[in-house]
C-alpha cells in the first residue's frame, strides 16, 4: 500500500484559509500563518458583532421612538409604560417603523398610551 503524504490535504486547507483572507492587506492575504491568524481574528469579530448588532438596532429603535413620542408630548419611558398599561404588545422595531412610515397610525397608538397613563403623568410631559 502506498504511503500517504497529505500534500493534497494541506494544499486544500491552505487554499481554504487564503480564500477566506481574500481582500486583506499586505502579507495577511498571502502568507498562510499570518492569513490564518487574520481569518481567525475576523471570525471572532464577526461573532462578537453579531451580538452587538442586536444591541445597536434596539438602541436605534429606542432613539427613534423617543424622538417620535416627544413630538406628541411624552417621553420614551412614559410611552412604554402607557403601552404596557393599555395592554398594547408591539415590539420596538415595529413601533419605530410605524413612526417613520405611518405617522397617523403611530399617533393613534400614542394617544391610546397617553389615555392609559394617570392624568398627572400625561400633563407633566
From Swiss-Prot:
Q: Which family does it belong to?
A: Belongs to the bacterial ribosomal protein bL20 family.
Q: What SUPFAM superfamilies is this protein classified in?
A: Ribosomal protein L20
Q: Name one GO molecular function term.
A: structural constituent of ribosome
Keyword Lyase set for record: no
Q: Which keywords appear in this protein's UniProt record, sorted alphabetically?
A: Ribonucleoprotein, Ribosomal protein, RNA-binding, rRNA-binding
Any signal peptide, and if so, which residues?
none
Q: Which InterPro entries match?
A: Ribosomal_bL20 (IPR005813), RIBOSOMAL_L20_CS (IPR049946), Ribosomal_protein_bL20_C (IPR035566)
Q: What is this protein called?
A: Large ribosomal subunit protein bL20
Lineage here is:
Bacteria, Pseudomonadati, Pseudomonadota, Alphaproteobacteria, Hyphomicrobiales
Q: Which organism is it from?
A: Methylobacterium nodulans (strain LMG 21967 / CNCM I-2342 / ORS 2060)
One Gene Ontology BP term is: ribosomal large subunit assembly
**Cited function:** Binds directly to 23S ribosomal RNA and is necessary for the in vitro assembly process of the 50S ribosomal subunit. It is not involved in the protein synthesizing functions of that subunit.
A GO CC annotation recorded here is: ribosome
